[in-house]
């Protein structure tokens, strides 16, 4: 036979178990949410440098243009020649997560210094693909970005024959 005191304790214990069971069920039904991982940064590497090839400059100079597809054209009295020097656009390989929006920002015009004196002005041109673009490849398969440029050449006194070298910047974001 149960006394009222032991009945009270039994009901109290049963109620506590029921409350604890409900709390456990409530806690199990709560879904945790957190902020997603930040996107991985782009990985960019130079696959090929920009090259304008060989030319013969005239008396007034002009411009040499390399488009992103690799074609070369000239203005003024510049004569394009091959002479074993190839011309081609710069190619960068980008690895990014699929769906990443990639912007290309060209740096400022730069001066290329000649080994026999003189400087040439380099303007970075358009790209293929055009900016901005969405990466559709996985990081194991890089996308190639081709960038052309325009080189301004003066007369032979201002720009004596020789090799001209310099560095330009392009930002991928």
Task: Put a short name on every predicted segment.
Residues 98, 106-132:
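Surface-exposed binding patches on compact interaction domains or structured appendages
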């Amino acid at each position: 036979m149960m006394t009222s005191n032991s009945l009270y304790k039994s009901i109290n214990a049963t109620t506590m178990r029921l409350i604890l069971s409900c709390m456990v069920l409530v806690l199990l039904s709560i879904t945790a949410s957190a902020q997603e991982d930040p996107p991985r940064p782009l990985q960019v590497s130079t696959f090929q440098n920009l090259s304008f090839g060989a030319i013969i400059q005239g008396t007034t100079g002009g411009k040499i243009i390399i488009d992103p597809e690799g074609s070369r054209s000239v203005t003024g009295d510049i004569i394009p020649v091959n002479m074993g020097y190839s011309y081609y656009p710069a190619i960068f390989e980008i690895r990014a997560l699929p769906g990443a929006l990639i912007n290309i920002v060209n740096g400022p015009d730069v001066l290329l210094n000649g080994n026999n004196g003189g400087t040439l002005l380099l303007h970075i041109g358009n790209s293929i693909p055009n900016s901005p673009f969405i990466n559709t490849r996985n990081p194991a398969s890089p996308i190639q970005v081709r960038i052309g440029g325009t080189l301004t050449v003066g007369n032979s006194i201002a720009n004596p024959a020789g090799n001209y070298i310099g560095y330009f910047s392009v930002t991928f974001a």
